[in-house]
Amino acid sequence: MWQRIQTLYLGLAAAIVFAMFFCTFATIIGPDGTKITIVYSEKIAYLSLMIMMFIAQVAAAASFKAFFLQARVAVIAGLLAIGFQIWLGIDILRNLDGMSFNVTALFPLVAAALDFMAAQRSMVDEMTLQAVKSTRKGRRKRQK
């Protein structure tokens, strides 16, 4: 399962999404100097999207024997990650004043890039497999 590079990409993307469950999204510094941290899992919308992204990552990594299915699920996971990144970007632009945002806000973008690279590698593997099957089939017909 872990011999193919696309499975490693998907595993790394799943680890990035899993890490977001425990990371802070932003810090609010009050007028009296108190710090309030906001974790991704505090917002229900963020939590539900992160759960969906993590399930899609694991499902894509688990479907390593079906290359087309793996590529499709990886693309879906990447689109979910891009949607989540857009949502985070809108929230950041809305609350730019008074909040300090963490670098983990870019994790969905990294996960999406890994998902799309995994989908591309999965399709390359499937095309290579189809070409080898086609070549072998042609040789067998000529030998008869």
Would you name each region that the model predicts?
Residues 37-55:
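Interfacial helix-start motif at the membrane-water boundary
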Residues 89-102:
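Membrane-helix boundary connector in multi-pass membrane proteins
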Residues 72-89:
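Hydrophobic alpha-helical membrane segments
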Residues 1-20:
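Cytosolic juxtamembrane helix and N-cap/initiation of the first transmembrane helix
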Residues 99-124:
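Alpha-helical membrane-associated segments of multi-pass integral membrane proteins
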Residues 15-43:
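Hydrophobic transmembrane helix segments
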Residues 118-140:
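Cytosolic juxtamembrane helix at the C-terminal end of the final transmembrane segment
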Residues 57-71:
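Juxtamembrane helix-break-helix junctions at the cytosolic face
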